[in-house]
């Protein structure tokens, strides 16, 4: 057996399958594209669903990849076991209706045992198969030559994740030797059991059935192969280390952490857990942030926040009590640079995001301690010495408090924690996660006639907008037909088309097919599984027939508007990088005739002056009349030129490059203006946040920009007319009006204060003695809480000693103020507690200091009842 680095294993795997005729699929972003069912890419096959369910036919049915993945369903086990991770790499080979079991098994065996490749001792390998999969069993037994005792039939060896492809699987195990287990009485000591001796190194899934919506299984029209080999696990064997964490994928991170902590890995098993958690979580967070995810309170952002906080908490166990995770980002970049150079390129931005989040969490820990103090005080008041499990879980889930930390503080206060309640809440969360996983992994059921259409369809719409086309296929209601008549809707494929199919954010062209037999309007164009342009049509006259010729005519006005907006998005993308930083990446776009929408990653808001600079830069490039050059290059050569490859796009070996002078260079399959001057004008309409770390700009160009600015000017002129001034003098006029308004407000406040003082004089006559305490509870006229507070302050001074509650109703809402003079505060009267009780009786809540507190209520009809309660409350204190 060879001793290989992780980079060598990855490279060797891909090279082996390339030699077997496989195309290497680049590792996709961890953030799924066009798959809302997934929070993260969580397996090698997750990015290939579109091939397996037939939505897209790949150029090569044999595919291999090294896919970065994230799974967080077992996060609590990470660091405590040898092989649980949140971030990992899956090496996989896949067949989309090409080879099947025989080749998959033979190639797996060759890769693992051949001296040219991994070179495992065949005697150390065992396999599991499904009891009913005789075909796989016979291949292993009769063709590979494995003895029967090393082929274990296990019932669970059937891969099924809901509707879609499913089938039996076979797993290959490596025997690490007796040092990892030799108890003959251990019921789990076998390949496939729960033990450390027999490690699963490869899972081969044979997708041969459709799991139908009604629960039945039917044979797939095309059988598939889906395999997965965990890189970390394979490296632990090849590098002869006890766990994945001692491999070259983790040890440099652990060594760097030792330098920060002043502690050593391998000396204390409990402290080793902290080192492992930190090493695992920084890998996950580094890659996720690099792919565009940012910490937040929901979705992916919440996962990142939770991982960082878990690592920071564990860091305390090895003496690290400051932000430090960000210092490990360059280490991750160095380890992974062979296959993921982008991590090193983005290291500064990733580190900045992580540092900000760490600093925020250190502040949050203090908040959590304050919440814990309140929880303990509440429990003690109720006569309990046990912190409820739900509260312990809330501290854990919301504030990142581990159960052990809560227990530690509880013990200091002579209290304990309800473990059973905590576990119940934890199990509910696990159930939610399991339910989510059941939903997210299912693929669409394989089938449909579109995948069977192999006829070539050529797109010529970059250069021609009117061409003569022959209809080669008509699909109506999912079935092929020979013709469709007036009023009917269908999808057609033609031999030559000028219509652009929606992709890369650019919407589809519209237009018509016109011929002697009929006319059809093109409503939409999408790509069929085999890449042809699929036109959605409505027949307006006569009939559209297969084999007939038609004039295909694109709506030139809409296309001219689309190309202006598309080239403008390229200019905008570069301007965003120039102004905001190189970390900005496209996260989605819409290029329509009437507007463009551009989503991008950015950590923070875009300031108004930054927006102005961005808009000015784009217009500057437009007015320079820069030629737009389009050419084709090999992918690696285009990237070497500095061409931007966009979010979620898959590229072939030869790519289309759009170059705008020396300013912008992008890989793009869309339609563009020949010269930036054709855009005319660019105007940003809005900028907003649409999610954690993602911003959106909407803009218009050309005539739409002119109309937008004309409308804005008209509004300005109308406002100026109403204020009897000119647009140029509008600011000065508004400044004058605001000055007048402020003066009127001051006069109004002064008058209101005098009225309040007069009302306070009147209210002093309504004071009642309750148990020797002067009490005033009254409904008054007040415009806002400030007026109420001023009135209460005035009454406190006038009365000297009193408990006061005032209520005012504005717009159906109740405002309450409670005030207690200092002498009565010392006797136990508390304005905050009083106002809370009063507010609860009119549908509200509030609180505050012992001497002054405010609240609100929703039910104005119950104000009288609420005020009546004041006397009752005072009696309860007396």
Swiss-Prot record:
Cellular compartments annotated: Cytoplasm
DNA damage recorded as keyword: no
Alphabetic keyword roster: Aminoacyl-tRNA synthetase, ATP-binding, Cytoplasm, Ligase, Metal-binding, Nucleotide-binding, Protein biosynthesis, RNA-binding, tRNA-binding, Zinc
One Gene Ontology cellular component: cytosol
Enzyme class: ligase
Residues binding Zn(2+), per UniProt: 566, 570, 668, 672
GO molecular function, one term: ATP binding
Cofactor: Zn(2+)
One of the protein's GO biological processes: alanyl-tRNA aminoacylation
Superkingdom, natural source: Bacteria
Origin species: Geobacillus thermodenitrificans (strain NG80-2)
Role summary: Catalyzes the attachment of alanine to tRNA(Ala) in a two-step reaction: alanine is first activated by ATP to form Ala-AMP and then transferred to the acceptor end of tRNA(Ala). Also edits incorrectly charged Ser-tRNA(Ala) and Gly-tRNA(Ala) via its editing domain.
Main location: cytoplasm
Name listed for the protein in its UniProt record: Alanine--tRNA ligase
Domain notes: Consists of three domains; the N-terminal catalytic domain, the editing domain and the C-terminal C-Ala domain. The editing domain removes incorrectly charged amino acids, while the C-Ala domain, along with tRNA(Ala), serves as a bridge to cooperatively bring together the editing and aminoacylation centers thus stimulating deacylation of misacylated tRNAs.
Lineage, broadest ranks: Bacteria, Bacillati, Bacillota, Bacilli, Bacillales
Family: Belongs to the class-II aminoacyl-tRNA synthetase family.
EC number: 6.1.1.7
Entries under PROSITE patterns matching the protein: AA_TRNA_LIGASE_II_ALA
């Amino acid at each position: 057996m060879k001793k290989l680095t992780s980079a060598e294993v990855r490279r060797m795997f891909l090279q082996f399958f390339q030699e077997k005729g496989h195309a290497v699929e680049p590792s996709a972003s961890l953030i799924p594209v066009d798959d809302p069912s997934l929070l993260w890419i969580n397996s090698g096959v997750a990015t290939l669903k579109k091939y397996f369910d037939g939505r897209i036919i790949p150029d090569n049915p044999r595919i291999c990849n090294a896919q970065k993945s994230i799974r967080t369903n077992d996060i609590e086990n990470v660091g405590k076991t040898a092989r649980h991770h949140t971030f990992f790499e899956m090496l996989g080979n896949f067949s989309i209706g090409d080879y099947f079991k025989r080749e998959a098994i033979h190639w797996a065996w060759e890769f693992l045992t051949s001296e040219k490749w991994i070179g495992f001792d065949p005697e150390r390998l065992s396999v599991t198969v499904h009891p009913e999969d005789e075909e796989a069993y016979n291949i292993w037994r009769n063709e590979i030559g494995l003895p029967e005792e090393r082929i274990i039939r296990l019932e669970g060896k059937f891969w099924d994740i809901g509707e879609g492809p499913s089938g039996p699987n076979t797993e290959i195990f490596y025997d690490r030797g007796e040092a990892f287990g030799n108890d003959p009485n251990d019921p789990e000591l076998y390949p496939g059991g729960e033990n450390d001796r027999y490690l699963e190194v490869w899972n081969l899934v044979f997708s041969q059935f459709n799991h139908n919506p009604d629960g039945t299984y039917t044979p797939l029209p095309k059988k598939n192969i889906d395999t997965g080999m965990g890189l970390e696990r394979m490296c632990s064997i090849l590098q002869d280390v006890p766990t994945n964490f001692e491999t070259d994928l983790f040890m440099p991170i652990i060594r760097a952490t030792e330098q920060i902590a002043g502690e050593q890995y391998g000396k204390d098993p409990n402290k080793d857990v902290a080192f492992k958690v930190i090493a695992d979580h920084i890998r996950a967070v580094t890659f996720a942030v690099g792919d565009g995810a940012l910490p937040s309170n929901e979705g992916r952002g919440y996962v990142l926040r939770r991982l960082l906080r878990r690592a920071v908490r564990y860091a305390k166990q090895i003496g690290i009590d400051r932000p430090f995770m960000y210092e490990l980002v360059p280490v991750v970049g160095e380890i992974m640079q062979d296959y993921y150079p982008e991590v090193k390129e983005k290291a500064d931005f990733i580190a900045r995001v992580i540092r900000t989040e760490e600093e925020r969490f250190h502040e949050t820990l203090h908040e959590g301690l304050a919440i814990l103090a309140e929880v303990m005080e509440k429990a003690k008041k109720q006569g309990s010495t046990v912190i409820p499990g739900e509260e312990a879980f809330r501290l854990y889930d919301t504030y990142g408090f581990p159960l052990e930390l809560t227990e530690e503080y509880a013990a200091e206060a002579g209290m304990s924690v309800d473990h059973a309640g905590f576990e119940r809440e934890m199990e509910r969360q696990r159930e939610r996660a399991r339910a989510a996983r059941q939903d997210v992994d299912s693929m669409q059921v394989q089938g449909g006639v579109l995948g069977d259409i192999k006829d070539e369809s050529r797109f010529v719409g970059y250069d021609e907008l009117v061409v003569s086309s022959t209809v080669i296929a008509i699909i109506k209601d999912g079935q092929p037909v020979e013709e469709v008549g007036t009023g009917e809707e269908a999808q057609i494929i033609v031999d030559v088309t000028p219509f652009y199919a929606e992709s890369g954010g650019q919407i589809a062209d519209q237009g018509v097919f016109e011929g002697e037999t009929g006319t059809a309007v093109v409503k939409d164009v999408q790509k069929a599984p085999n890449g042809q342009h699929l036109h959605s049509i409505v027949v307006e006259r006569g009939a559209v027939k297969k084999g007939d010729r038609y004039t295909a005519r694109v709506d030139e006005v809409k296309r001219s508007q689309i190309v202006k907006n598309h080239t403008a998005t390229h200019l905008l993308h570069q301007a965003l990088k120039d102004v905001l930083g190189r970390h900005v990446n496209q996260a989605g776009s819409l290029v329509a005739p009437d507007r463009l929408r551009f989503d991008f990653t950015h950590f923070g808001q875009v300031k108004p002056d930054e927006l102005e600079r961005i808009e000015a830069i784009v217009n500057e490039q437009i007015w320079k009349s820069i030629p737009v050059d389009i050419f084709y290059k090999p992918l690696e050569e285009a990237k070497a030129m500095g061409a931007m490859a966009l979010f979620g796009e898959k590229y072939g070996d030869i790519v289309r490059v759009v170059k705008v002078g020396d300013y912008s260079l992008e890989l793009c399959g869309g339609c563009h203006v020949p010269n930036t001057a054709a855009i005319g004008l660019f105007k940003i309409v809005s900028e907003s946040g649409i999610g954690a770390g993602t911003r959106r700009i909407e803009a218009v160009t050309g005539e739409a920009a002119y109309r937008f600015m004309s409308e804005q000017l008209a509004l300005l002129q109308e406002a100026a007319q109403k204020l009897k001034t000119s647009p140029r003098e509008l600011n000065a006029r508004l400044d004058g009006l605001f000055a007048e308004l402020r003066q009127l407000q001051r006069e109004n406040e002064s008058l209101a204060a005098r009225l309040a003082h007069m009302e306070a004089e009147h209210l002093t006559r309504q004071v009642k003695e309750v148990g020797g305490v002067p009490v005033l509870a009254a409904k008054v006229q007040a415009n806002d809480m400030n007026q109420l507070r001023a009135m209460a302050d005035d009454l406190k001074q006038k009365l000297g000693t009193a408990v006061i509650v005032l209520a005012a109703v504005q717009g159906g809402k109740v405002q309450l103020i409670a005030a207690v003079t200092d002498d009565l505060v010392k006797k136990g009267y508390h304005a905050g507690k009083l106002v809370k009780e009063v507010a609860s009786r009119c549908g509200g809540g509030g609180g505050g200091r012992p001497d002054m507190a405010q609240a609100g209520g929703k039910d104005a009809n119950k104000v009288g009842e609420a005020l009546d309660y004041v006397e009752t409350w005072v009696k309860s204190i007396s």
